[in-house]
Regions:
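Interdomain hinge/lid region at the active-site interface
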Residues: 113-117, 123
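Structural motif
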Residues: 51-52, 127
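Acidic, divalent-metal-coordinating active-site segment for phosphoryl/phosphodiester hydrolysis
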Residues: 41-47
Length: 135
């Protein structure tokens, strides 16, 4: 709730490094990215949430419990599927839509050939929690 975010490098005579000038305009509206990148403006947590830079805003005492809850939720999912979905999302955003769809199809073909896929679908039918092995 009390966090402030920004890319203040231009106020120091620098440009943001580590891909900031490339990643930020891909993550939020370009005009908002320009405002942050070109003026070194800082924003509060609510504004970061409003523009889609963060997924949620929580009080400081709930930051770690919330992060742990999110991590636990992700860990309950099939690790190979999570990895493939992440790869499709990150790589796919950087390519034309048709290429991204092809990548998604190939990754899905791989995932559906794994033991984890069989475990996940079997557990669903049997109404139990899956036990994934990353295989």
């Amino acid at each position: 709730e009390k966090s402030r975010l920004g890319v203040p490098e231009v106020t120091l005579g620098l440009i943001p490094g580590d891909g900031g000038t490339q990643r930020l305009p891909r993550a939020i509206p370009r005009c908002k990215a320009a405002e942050l990148l070109l003026m070194g403006k800082m924003i509060d947590a609510q504004e970061a949430y409003r523009i889609g830079l963060v997924n949620t805003v929580v009080p400081v005492e709930k930051v770690m419990p919330t992060a742990k809850e999110w991590a636990e939720q992700m860990c309950r999912c099939g690790p190979l599927a999570v990895r493939a979905a992440k790869q499709a999302m990150l790589r796919g955003c950087e390519m034309p839509l048709e290429d991204g769809l092809r990548l998604e199809y190939m990754l899905n073909a791989y995932v559906t050939s794994t033991e984890d896929f069989t475990e996940g679908t079997t557990a669903f039918v049997e109404k139990r929690k899956p036990v994934y092995k990353g295989k």
